[in-house]
Amino acid sequence: HYDPSIKKILPHSKMYTIQIGNERFILSGASLSSDAPSYFTNYFSQSANSDQVLFIDRSPRIFQYIYSHLQGYHVEIDDADTFTGLFSDALYYHLPQLRQLILNSDYYYANIGGESIKVSKKLLSGRGNTPNFFTVANDSLYKDISDIITDMNWIRPPPQAAPSLNRSPILFKELVHMLQGAEPEIRSPEHRRSLIKEAKYYRFNALAEKLQNIIEVYNPFTGAQEIAVSLDSIN
């Protein structure tokens, strides 16, 4: 739970300068102590370094998120590459609270067909649709490597890319809409088969079964083929 108290690891009112790449950031001792012990507090706690500029060769764009986090703001992450970069730097800077916030994020992130996808963990945790690709990938890519890096005490985390899939982002979004409760909009038998194939790929087994229970029927009153859904597949 949230604890507003801040340990006095560094003098709270003293300002410290950190240069990340080609950008400088100034943070108070209170901000740096709010997520500690860390790379920063370990450095500035040494008397010889207390008035020095700390130079670090990492991404200033990613550090903007860390800067906001240390100041006490909620950090909103919109894309998979930023999520993965922030996770790597939370490990690099030894920020325990940020690491836990990322691992306990409410969202899964991935690059699907070249498009960044952000989807609610709660949405993908429904009965019959979990475990799935995202639950397994999230644990293996983020949680497991986090534990390994911590245990091995590496100087910096290895290069890491967000989960990337050569699948259709359009079909994935349609599956997500169905998981949100929307009725399937089946345009053709081929479209239905594609949706079933994608649902099975992601291990959305209950959704795949629902799609398999959709049948085409001929309506003699309209003279057209229509989509019908078995009553057994409607929750």
Language-model-detected regions and their locations in the chain:
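BTB/POZ (also called T1 in voltage-gated K+ channels) oligomerization domain detector
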Residues: 1-67, 72-165
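Hydrophobic, ordered structural segments
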Residues: 68-74, 78-101, 175-183, 187-219
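BTB/POZ-protein C-terminal extensions
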Residues: 116-197, 212-235
